Regions:
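Short beta-strand immediately N-terminal to the catalytic nucleophile in serine-hydrolase-like folds
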Residues: 152-155
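Acidic helix/loop microenvironments that form the catalytic cleft of cell-wall polysaccharide enzymes
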Residues: 69, 157-158
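Short, hydrophobic alpha-helix immediately C-terminal to the catalytic nucleophile
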Residues: 130-133, 163-164
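Short glycine-enriched nucleophile-adjacent loop
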Residues: 159-170
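Non-catalytic accessory segments of hydrolases
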Residues: 1-126, 147
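Hydrophobic pocket-lining residues that define ligand/cofactor binding sites across diverse proteins
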Residues: 140
Length: 170
């Protein structure tokens, strides 16, 4: 299960290339060479924040959190450039990665641990999305966002993941 990022005072330098969670090569990953190779890294649970400039001290912008699609097997937060959306609509846009495929939705009794409430909990991808939302709630004001005005949206499997959170007790 994801753990809270504790280094609130640390500056995390942005990556030049988007980090993808492990996935097969595909059109969604932007890497389709007809190979059976996997791309990405398990060190992939990052988010990007796009904020418009020119904010007044007391002003807070609405926040949009985007969940990428890709059948929960492929895709990543770097699929689209949300800088224009943030600037034109005066919103803060948060884009997230979450674990995919068997790393995101694999169930096995050996996965049980003292921190898990349910036996063989398998929805690690969903838990990654929930933790990203929790992080956003705790930290978005530092980027000019309004923590009381957050909209979660997604495309394809990302939209289905958003919908699944409506049924989640978390």
């Amino acid at each position: 299960a994801p753990v809270e990022f504790e280094r609130a005072d640390a500056v995390v330098e942005p990556f030049a290339e988007p980090v993808m969670c492990p996935q097969p090569q595909s059109q969604a990953s932007g890497q389709n060479e007809g190979k059976d190779d996997y791309l990405g890294s398990e060190d992939c649970l990052y988010l990007d924040i796009y904020a418009p400039g020119g904010q007044k001290e007391s002003e807070r912008w609405p926040v949009m959190v985007w969940v990428h699609g890709g059948s929960n097997l492929t895709g990543h937060k770097g699929t689209y450039d949300f800088a224009r959306l943030a600037a034109r609509q005066q919103v803060v846009v948060v884009v997230i990665n979450y674990r995919l495929g068997p790393l995101g939705w694999f169930s096995h009794p050996a996965l049980n641990g003292p921190q898990l409430d349910a036996p063989a909990l398998a929805n690690f991808g969903t838990l990654d999305i929930i933790e990203a939302l929790r992080w956003t709630q705790r930290n978005i004001t530092g980027f000019g966002g309004d923590a009381d005005n957050v909209t979660l949206f997604g495309e394809s499997a990302g939209g289905r993941n958003v919908f699944s959170l409506l049924a989640s007790p978390m």
